């Protein structure tokens, strides 16, 4: 799994764990779970909101890997 996919999968897990409290999901926590550096979120997605948006779209479309 590449870094971008690791970030997406970690974010999806955190979204599932935190439910409606997305504001509690931090970039630092995402990166820790994904095993990547903080700068990679901005590199691949621009910001946390865009990352979360992409993850939610993926969850809705049913393309989540478990």
Positions of predicted regions on the chain:
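The alpha-helix within a helix-turn-helix
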Residues: 31
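Alpha-helical DNA-recognition elements
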Residues: 13, 47, 58
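HTH DNA-binding helix-turn interface
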Residues: 17-21, 35, 42-54
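Generic N-terminal leader/processing signal
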Residues: 1-2, 46
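Amphipathic alpha-helical linker/stalk segments
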Residues: 55-66
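Short, amphipathic alpha-helix enriched in basic
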Residues: 2-28, 39
């Amino acid at each position: 799994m590449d870094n971008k996919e690791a970030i997406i999968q970690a974010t999806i897990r955190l979204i599932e764990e935190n439910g409606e409290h997305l504001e509690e999901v931090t970039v630092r926590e995402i990166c820790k779970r994904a095993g990547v550096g903080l700068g990679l979120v901005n590199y691949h997605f621009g910001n946390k909101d865009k990352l979360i948006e992409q993850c939610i779209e993926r969850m809705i479309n049913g393309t989540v890997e478990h």
